[in-house]
UniProtKB/Swiss-Prot annotation:
GO cellular component: cytoplasm
UniProt-annotated location(s): Cytoplasm
Protein family according to the UniProt entry: Belongs to the PTH family.
Binding annotation for tRNA: 15, 65, 67, 113
Broad class of the protein's primary localization: cytoplasm
Name the record gives this protein: Peptidyl-tRNA hydrolase
Function: Hydrolyzes ribosome-free peptidyl-tRNAs (with 1 or more amino acids incorporated), which drop off the ribosome during protein synthesis, or as a result of ribosome stalling.
Encoding gene per record: pth
InterPro entries recorded: Pept_tRNA_hydro, Pept_tRNA_hydro_CS, Pept_tRNA_hydro_sf
Keyword Hydrolase among record annotations: yes
Listed EC numbers: 3.1.1.29
Species of origin: Ehrlichia canis (strain Jake)
Length: 193
């Protein structure tokens, strides 16, 4: 039985390494660490199928804009008959501290348009890993903030490395231990150089 790990983001080089693409960054790191094959386009998504230890895993990056993420993910879930309990979505979250992660199942979408889209097509009964991107310090418009680049990319990469290092705990549904392990990394701030 497959597990689906999906990362949310926007396609296009102008969005690479932006806060809103934190989910894509996690999926790319998993692909590299576990030597998955290169992504192939299928059903408006980039997918790669491989193994993480004994788990058969499909990595997914919806190749649509964030607001339309639900359709390609629904198509992959349907095609591979993936139970929603085996689906984990990685996404950016402005309501938690920079480079902090939280795992939850179901619940609200906190205004995240990618999650709203998934919820519309699949319901809410799936796992989410919320990647904290912090909240803008000044009066910057929220949409401009999430589409801006990280200042402290080293901290982002360290957090992503910790997520990838402990990803098997998520697949085992050991969410509390996963969160504790990733939390034990250093605290960071995303301050300009």
């Amino acid at each position: 039985m497959f597990h689906l790990l999906a990362g949310l983001g926007n396609p296009g080089t102008q969005y690479t390494l932006t806060r809103h693409n934190a989910g894509f960054m996690v999926i790319d790191a998993i692909l590299d660490k576990f030597h998955f094959p290169n992504f192939k386009k299928k059903n408006n998504a980039l997918i790669s199928i491989g193994n993480i230890e004994s788990y058969r895993v499909i990595l997914v990056k919806p190749w649509t804009f964030m607001n339309n993420s639900g359709v390609p993910i629904m198509n992959i879930v349907s095609l591979y008959k993936i139970p929603l309990d085996n689906m984990i979505v990685f996404h950016d979250e402005v309501e938690i501290d920079f480079c902090t992660i939280r795992v939850k199942k179901s619940g609200g979408n906190a205004g995240h348009n990618g999650l709203k889209s998934i919820d519309n097509f699949l319901g809410k009964d799936y796992w989410r890993v919320r990647f904290g991107i912090g909240h803008p310090r000044n009066k910057m418009d929220l949409s401009d903030y999430v589409l801006s680049h990280f200042h402290n990319l080293n901290a982002v990469n360290n957090t992503i490395s910790s997520i990838v290092e402990h990803i098997t705990l998520l697949l085992e549904k050991n969410h509390t231990t996963f969160t504790d392990k990733v939390r034990n990394t250093l605290k960071y701030e995303d301050i300009p150089d």
